[in-house]
Amino acid sequence: GRCGCHGYKATAGWRFGNLIDGTQAEYVLVPDAQANLAPIPDGLSDEQVLMCPDIMSTGFKGAENANIRIGDTVVVFAQGPIGLCATAGARLMGATTIITVDGNDHRLGISKKMGADVTLNFNNCDVVDEIMKLTGGRGADASIEALGLQSTFESALRVLKPGGTLSSLGVYSSDLTIPLSAFAAGLGDNVRRWIWPCRD
């Protein structure tokens, strides 16, 4: 079959797209291709596998970093392609309840097909209040932020139960402000960021 990028777990890791230019090009030289590429089965079109190398792996890694366990309530903020894949990943990881947040009803409808149990349009309600009501005031076990805005990051933080896990996938254009009270609530060990990992 044809080959497609394996995603972040490939042994090249952070080098793809950061130290090796051109990974969005039609062709790219892949070091250690035997370990860093996975075959795409014959019979699948380019359109069917288009999101696998970057978008799907990013969304699924966000769900993996959220430490989701069976029985957990997970909130996924933003339902663009990466957020939708994070929603599917949360379902596959065993989340019992998945709440998705977006401002676009069409995307929220797709998120239902990807595994969401409850969808919230931020144009129609205060999503933090609504999520706290849905969780009986307890908060979510995990939240995944897939947009990259201060406001969505803050909301993802505010809906967590004490000690909950925030998995951040968004690319932020400026520095984030995180209230110190979040660390007092036990968040310090449970904020996980995947998109900009440290180099060795």
How would you describe each model-predicted region?
Residues 1-36:
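Glycine-rich phosphate/adenylate-binding loop and adjacent beta-alpha elements
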Residues 39-125, 129, 142:
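Mid-domain Rossmann-like dinucleotide-binding core that forms the NAD(H)/NADP(H) cofactor-binding site
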Residues 66-68, 135, 147, 159-161:
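A generic alpha-to-beta junction signature in SAM-dependent methyltransferases
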Residues 95, 117, 122, 149-200:
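Glycine-rich phosphate-binding loop and adjacent beta-alpha segment
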Residues 126-132, 151-152:
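Short acidic active-site motifs
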Residues 134-142:
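A glycine-rich helix->loop->beta "capping" turn
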